A protein has these predicted regions:
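Disorder-to-helix initiation segments
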Residues: 49-71, 145, 149
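Acidic, low-complexity proline/glycine-rich segments
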Residues: 36-54
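Helix-loop segments that flank and shape redox-cofactor active sites
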Residues: 55-63, 77-103, 166-181
C-alpha cells in the first residue's frame, strides 16, 4: 500500500514502517538499514601496542608484557593446584587446611586479575586460554592423582618458591626499565606470595597437637 498525502502531512507511519519500527529498525519506503554484525579483531594475541598515555618506550613495554604474561600463566597454574588440594584435602586437620587453601586460591585468582589488567594497560594482550597459560607457565603443575596432605602442601610450597624467585626477577626488571607502577604491583604480589609460602612452611613443621592415633 502507498502512503497517502494525508499520512505524509501528519507524519504517520506507512505499514511497512510500523512493522519495522517494532523491531527497532526504521526505514524509508521499503529500504531497511541494520547495524553491521561483522566480526572485528581489535588487537591480535601476542601483539604489543605501547600505550601513549603511559609514555613507556615500545621496546620496554614488550619486555614488561612478556614478563607479566609469564607471571600471569604461573599464577593461574598455582590457582588450579590450590583449588585441587582445597577440594581433596582430608584428615584430622581437614577443616583448617581446606579453608586456608580456599583463601590462598582466591588470593592467587585476584593476583592473576591484577597482572592481566596491567598487561592490558601497558598495551599487551593478556593470556587467556587454558592451553596457552599452561604452556607459558615456568612451573609444572601436579598431575591429577590425589596425594596425601603433606605431599600436596609440599608441592604447593615448592611452586610458591619458584614463583617467588621469578617475581623478584621481574620486579627488578620493571624497576630497571623505569616502570615503577608495575614494580609496585609486583612488590605487593611478592609480599603475598612470601606470606603464603611461609604459612605452608608452618603447616609442614613436625610439631603438632594432633595425636598419631587421630
Amino acid at each position: 500500500p502507498r502512503r497517502t498525502p494525508e499520512c505524509a502531512q501528519i507524519g504517520c507511519l506507512h505499514p511497512c514502517q510500523r512493522l519495522t519500527a517494532k523491531k527497532g529498525k526504521w526505514v524509508e519506503g521499503v529500504r531497511e538499514t541494520a547495524m553491521s554484525t561483522q566480526e572485528t579483531v581489535r588487537q591480535q594475541a601476542g601483539s604489543v601496542e605501547a600505550s601513549e598515555a603511559l609514555r613507556l618506550e615500545q621496546e620496554k613495554v614488550e619486555q614488561l608484557v612478556e614478563a607479566l604474561n609469564t607471571d600471569l600463566a604461573a599464577t593461574y597454574v598455582l590457582y588450579h593446584q590450590l583449588k585441587k588440594h582445597h577440594w581433596n584435602v582430608e584428615g584430622a586437620e581437614f577443616l583448617g587446611i581446606h579453608e586456608y587453601l580456599g583463601e590462598a586460591a582466591e588470593d592467587a585468582e585476584e593476583a592473576a586479575d591484577e597482572l592481566a589488567e596491567r598487561v592490558q594497560a601497558l598495551g599487551g594482550v593478556p593470556l587467556a586460554r587454558g592451553a596457552e597459560l599452561e604452556a607459558a607457565a615456568p612451573v609444572e603443575p601436579e598431575d591429577d592423582d590425589v596425594y596425601d596432605v603433606r605431599t600436596s602442601l609440599a608441592n604447593d610450597m615448592e611452586m610458591y618458591g619458584d614463583i617467588i624467585e621469578m617475581t623478584r626477577e621481574h620486579f627488578e626488571l620493571a624497576t630497571n626499565l623505569g616502570d615503577h607502577a608495575t614494580a609496585d604491583l609486583l612488590r605487593d604480589t611478592l609480599l603475598d606470595l612470601e606470606e603464603h609460602a611461609h604459612h605452608l612452611e608452618h603447616y609442614l613443621e613436625d610439631d603438632t597437637l594432633v595425636l598419631e592415633s587421630a
